[in-house]
């Protein structure tokens, strides 16, 4: 009986660890780092929480229709270490900004993405996400805009 309970405990522990690892570290499962794109739009929302922050960006498409993008950020602690705070986002709410994002894969929601870089109205380019493309800020289309 003790052997069965020990085996059951180990199985539950391993399964639980695998699920939590996937839930938090599944970047390449959820986002496509090979199809990153630049978005320009109006900052309309912010969620500053663990394990990731999020912001909303209203972007006009080619036909002039506005689409709202929900974009994932690094953890708030990592953002602060990179020099970006909640107050930076709040100060730019309602203003136009640029973002380099990697879109969500099919099945993970339309108009969802993970940010790499952002450039707010103050002109500062900030690292706010994982960098699957391994590009530098100087390579961004909005570097000199």
What is each of the regions a protein language model found here?
Residues 133-145:
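Glycine- and charge-enriched low-complexity intrinsically disordered segments
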Residues 41-43:
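Conserved hydrophobic positions within beta-strands
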Residues 68-86:
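Beta-strand/loop nucleic-acid-binding surfaces
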Residues 81-99:
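Short nucleic-acid-contacting surface segments enriched for D/E, G, S/T with interspersed K/R
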Residues 7-20:
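Bacterial N-terminal signal peptides
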Residues 23-37:
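Short boundary/loop segments of OB/S1/cold-shock single-stranded nucleic-acid-binding domains
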Residues 49-60:
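Short aromatic-glycine-enriched beta-strand elements
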């Amino acid at each position: 009986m003790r052997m069965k309970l020990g085996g059951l405990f180990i199985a539950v522990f391993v399964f639980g660890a695998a699920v939590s690892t996937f839930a938090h570290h599944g970047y390449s499962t959820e986002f496509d780092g090979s199809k990153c794109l630049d978005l320009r739009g109006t900052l309309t929302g912010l969620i500053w929480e663990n394990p990731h922050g999020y912001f909303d960006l209203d972007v006009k498409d080619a036909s002039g229709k506005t689409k709202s993008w929900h974009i994932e950020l690094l953890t708030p602690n990592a953002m602060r270490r990179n020099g970006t705070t909640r107050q930076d986002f709040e100060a730019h709410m309602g203003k136009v900004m640029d973002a380099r994002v990697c879109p969500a894969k099919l099945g993970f929601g339309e108009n969802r993405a993970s940010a790499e870089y952002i450039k707010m109205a103050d002109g500062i380019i900030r690292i706010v996400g994982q960098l699957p493309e391994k590009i530098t800020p100087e390579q961004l289309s909005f570097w000199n805009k």
